Amino acid sequence: MFDVIVIGGGHAGVEASAAAARMGKKTLLLTTLIEQIGAASCNPAIGGLAKGHLVKELDAMGGLMGEITDEAGIQFRILNESKGVAVQGSRAQIDMDKYRIIARNKLLKLPNLEISQEQASVLIVENDEVKGVKTNLENTYFAKKVILTTGTFLNGLIHVGENKLQAGRVGELASVNLGNYLQTLGLKMGRLKTGTCPRVDAKSIDFSVLEIQDGDVNPKAFSFRSKNFNPTQLPCYIARTNTTTHEIIKNNFYRAPLFTGQIEGVGPRYCPSIEDKINRFSDKESHHLFIEPQTIDATEYYINGFSTSLPYEVQIQMLRSVKGFEDAKITRFGYAIEYDYIEPTELKHTLELKKIKNLYCAGQINGTTGYEEAAAQGFMAGINASLSIDMKEPLILRRDEAYIGVLIDDLVVKGTKEPYRMFTSRAEFRLLLREENAILRLGKYGYDLGLLSEQDFTYIQNIANNLQKGLEFLLSKEFTPNNQNNAFLESLGEDKISSIVNLQKIVARASFDIEKLKKLDPMFETMDNYSLREILNEAKYYHYISMQKAQVEKMKNLSELKIPENFDFKSVSGLSNEVVEKLNHHKPPTIFAASQISGITPAALDILQIYIKMQKKKA
């Protein structure tokens, strides 16, 4: 008897099984190929805009993705560095082979975790409660909780031109039996589609005509736990399609599964195939292609931006029309893949299914796309399954606390009909949710769960104390426009002042940096750079942050008004049938969650709020 069974060893499965095992739960990970645990099926990169936030948040609570990325990374960059800190994003190119080896070894070394190379075929469900799993090897395993992290494997169908192949990934069997079984449970399900790009033999690329894209000179680690971070970095390159490339693609639209009706699943809006781009943006004469090394040996390159399901011979023809790729040899062809997913409105915020007790879902099965989105969900599913076994309150992150909270709330409340990916624009309180303050926002959760060490948490507390002291000093210290103070400002290269201001207003200037901050008071000279960066950020955006915090307080009032789990919305007089139907379907846990449901009017919220408050007074 296991406490937790995790089905699938991708990024969601890695985090789910690791979290459960590290929280002391006897855990079993079932995966089709142990060699492919933590495999990066698509591009060789972790992070990016908003995705980097997810990785930092995972790391802040004790997740694995940040540490593995730092160990396997071969190029590190901060995207949007010229823009505000709220929308900057960390991104790393990874050695794909090294990444999965590290992930696999981390799991194999964990106490409480067993791994078995088997494919789950059927779930054991009794009275709408999952009890265990049967596998293709006819083994039966019982567990208190089961977490589905099946990725693209549920009835996975690969498309290349007119050819179709049942697979979860090239060379790996699709999960047909489990996919068909889930259809019998009365869950709302659908089909989605994603795709991948060709990989090219490095020897066949003329790099001399490509634009070089180097990593940052002073790269920053993803994990706050990474020590002596000094990675070997490789360049990426930029190529461009041209009108010849576009003509080749247009002339073969009739062979594209995307346009022939062969593919039924909805693809990712923000990561379209090259044929979709040429069709949708027919006026553009060129599209960027990012040429990314797959490993530190750089023997193969991933052609990012060239995702396609066109026939093999067309892929060769269109790639060779690109400058620098005239003699290109494709080692692995691009393809599209369709797969089953469960509509995420079927889930609670804990990622447990509403209809099947003790059954959790994470990753692409919930309609998301991306390694980082999957890892975040897997981590939270592993935590909440473990907390439920211990009969403890679940960990549900609010939208103002974490991008992970935004991700899960969007899925559960709004649902999705297309592959969902995270953007900074999805977060209402993004100034509060910066990458660098993730440890300050979420570190205590990781520590309380036993996923962060005492040493890690002490480090976080020191930064929090420095931030509090530094900000209080800047807000309380007045600067008068006398000769001495103005001479000091001039020595820093700053403009003089003509009226009394506090130091926060001076530090908020765009030209004010860490070196200048250190000269304001000896206290700052003793602080580490992490603390100083956060003091600087908080000072620069102080008024905007204060406004967002005021908005959060309003939201918290609605979030704290909980709706009983089995609440009958029909019992509330004054609600329309449409509103009752939507509320009964979504089963929002709070008034705030109800406010996020499309079609729920302010008047309906007022009625519901008054009714629940009255019921609580009676109780």
From Swiss-Prot:
Residues annotated as binding NAD(+): 267-281
Homology family: Belongs to the MnmG family.
Organism for this UniProt entry:
Campylobacter jejuni subsp. jejuni serotype O:6 (strain 81116 / NCTC 11828)
> What cofactor does this protein call for?
FAD
Which GO biological process annotations does it have? tRNA methylation; tRNA wobble uridine modification
Give an example GO molecular function: flavin adenine dinucleotide binding
NCBIfam families to which the protein is assigned, alphabetical: mnmG_gidA
Indicate the principal place this protein occupies in or around the cell: cytoplasm
Give the SMART domains listed for this entry. Answer: GIDA_assoc_3
Q: Quick check: keyword Nucleus in the entry?
A: no
Checking PANTHER family in the record gives: GLUCOSE INHIBITED DIVISION PROTEIN A (PTHR11806), PROTEIN MTO1 HOMOLOG, MITOCHONDRIAL (PTHR11806:SF0)
Annotated function: NAD-binding protein involved in the addition of a carboxymethylaminomethyl (cmnm) group at the wobble position (U34) of certain tRNAs, forming tRNA-cmnm(5)s(2)U34.
Record's signal peptide: none
Residues annotated for FAD binding in this entry: 8-13
Provide GO CC annotations from the record.
cytosol
Subcellular localization: Cytoplasm
Q: What name does this protein carry?
A: tRNA uridine 5-carboxymethylaminomethyl modification enzyme MnmG
